[in-house]
């Protein structure tokens, strides 16, 4: 029987990992998950984040951002955290000294203007807190979803958005390539379109995999893809 997903449970898990491997950065719990904890435990987001930080949480992923425009969120992510609460979760975490990534999933029901509106909200919060370490964008994978009739965006559109995000988000140090959704070759090309980060190894991925997109790379493949373009791989 799966245990209830409560803040005390995850605080204990984070604390156990931190005590055993204090050199490991615990990167977990996106804003939608954190807000779920607030509802399950009748706690404020400040209390939830404070407990997890005390337990050893090091950084949080930018998952669940999709497009930070409520018109889009009502159609795509109804029931998830709204735009303001997603941003405020990051704001609170950054003010606690925590760091996080920011994401954008596009190519569904959003307009081009709403993609820029999303980037502008990330940019404004970064100006305020400086807490985002990386921005990762990827194209919507429609297979096996209620929007399966949408034509998926190709490499040209993906690389164009990569370049735009690098120009627009000049206050975010790292723009990450999404080889997880685009595959190795396009992920490698992204390094020529503004990306300077190939992300990390993945042990398991279940979100885009449900839409039929599965890409896994070894450390050597990631290093080689960087070196082939004349760059020197570095771990951050």
Which residues does each PLM region occupy?
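Non-cysteine beta-strand/loop elements that form the S-adenosyl-L-methionine
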Residues: 25-29, 49-68, 96, 129-140, ...
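Conserved, mostly hydrophobic/aromatic
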Residues: 60-63, 93, 122, 165, ...
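Catalytic cores of alpha/beta
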Residues: 44-48, 109-123, 182-193
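Single conserved hydrophobic/aromatic residue that forms the stacking wall/gate
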Residues: 2-14, 18
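Generic structural signal for well-ordered alpha-helices
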Residues: 12-15, 49, 87-90, 119-123, ...
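Alpha-helix N-cap and loop-to-helix initiation/capping positions
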Residues: 40-47, 77-85, 110-117, 150-157, ...
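Conserved strand-turn element in the central/C-terminal portion of the radical SAM core barrel
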Residues: 27-37, 68-70, 77-78, 89-114, ...
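Auxiliary Fe-S-binding modules of radical SAM enzymes
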Residues: 20-21, 126-236
């Amino acid at each position: 029987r799966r245990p209830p997903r409560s803040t005390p449970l995850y605080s204990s898990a984070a604390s156990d990992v931190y005590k055993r491997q204090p050199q490991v950065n615990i990167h977990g719990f996106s804003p939608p998950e954190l807000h779920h904890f607030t509802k399950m435990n009748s706690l404020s987001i400040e209390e939830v984040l404070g407990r997890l930080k005390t337990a050893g949480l090091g950084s949080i992923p930018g998952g669940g951002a999709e497009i930070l425009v409520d018109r889009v969120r009502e159609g795509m992510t109804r029931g998830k955290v709204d735009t303001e609460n997603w941003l405020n979760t990051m704001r609170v975490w950054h003010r606690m000294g925590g760091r996080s990534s920011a994401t954008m999933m596009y190519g569904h029901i959003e307009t081009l203007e709403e993609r820029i509106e999303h980037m502008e909200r990330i940019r404004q919060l970064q100006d305020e807190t400086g807490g985002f370490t990386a921005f990762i964008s990827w194209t919507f994978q429609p297979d096996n979803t209620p929007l399966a009739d949408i034509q998926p965006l190709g490499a040209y559109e993906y690389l164009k958005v990569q370049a735009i995000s690098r120009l627009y988000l000049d206050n975010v140090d790292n723009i990450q390539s999404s080889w997880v959704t685009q595959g190795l070759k396009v992920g490698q090309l992204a390094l020529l379109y503004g990306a300077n980060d190939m992300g990390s190894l993945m042990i398991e991925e279940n979100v885009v995999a449900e839409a039929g997109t599965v890409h896994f790379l070894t450390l050597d493949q990631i290093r080689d893809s960087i070196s082939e373009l004349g760059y020197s791989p570095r771990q951050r």
